[in-house]
Amino acid sequence: MFLIFSFFLFVQGYSQNSYRFKADITIKVKLQDGTFQYTKGSVRYDRNYKKVLYSTFFPQKEFYVSVDTLILKYVNDKLVSVQNNPLRPELSIFHFILNNDISDFGLKNSNFSITNVEKTDDLIITKWSPPVNPKFPFGTILVSTKNKRLQSVLIHNKKGEILNRQIYKKYSFINGIEIPSEILSVSYLAGVKSYQIIEFGKIQINEQGHDSEYDFQIAKNKL
């Protein structure tokens, strides 16, 4: 459900001032009949604790924790499921935002390398190529920027087929960093195209206090 916010990069380095992200979140998933399924709630992330926390209140009240390589789901304060997730929280869009790495999708500090740059009108399109590694699951990534703002990301598999396209819109300038408040994502899996729109509202950077809300304690014997 929330994997859209993460991919696979290997990012290091930190922005000195920003360490916490909090926002209301709405996820719209387009169904085959053209209607949308809505999920509404909030999201929190502290890069020191490295846990992405989602609280939903619609269509039902649920709580999700993305930690390490797991996603835990809670209903009525009870752990109901644990799923593997190869995309760690420190590889999420929230981490990129706090590091001020979002303009290049975190690729500058990854093991990808620039292999081509094109300029078309007011867009700069940068082609990032993956390392030479037969086990690496992804191919090239095209990143489009306008006035140093991330506009879109196009992710391919090793065969050159499109896996995912993301469009970033409605930027706000908060605490010295550019933050998109709307992301359109189109995924292509097994020949099926799926659409998601992710919207952030009431974005806060560096909320003070409330440490327990960012560092949710997980009972090890429950995993």
Where are these regions (language model features)?
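Gly/Pro-enriched, hydrophobic low-complexity segments
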Residues: 121-214
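Beta-turn initiation residues at beta-strand->coil junctions
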Residues: 27, 56-57, 74-78, 154-158, ...
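A short, Trp-centered hydrophobic/proline-enriched beta-strand micro-motif
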Residues: 16-36, 52-53
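Bacterial Sec-dependent N-terminal signal peptides
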Residues: 1-20
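Flexible, processing/modification-adjacent segments and terminal tails
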Residues: 16-19, 27, 74-138, 214-222
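Amphipathic hydrophobic-ligand
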Residues: 35-42, 63-68, 160-164
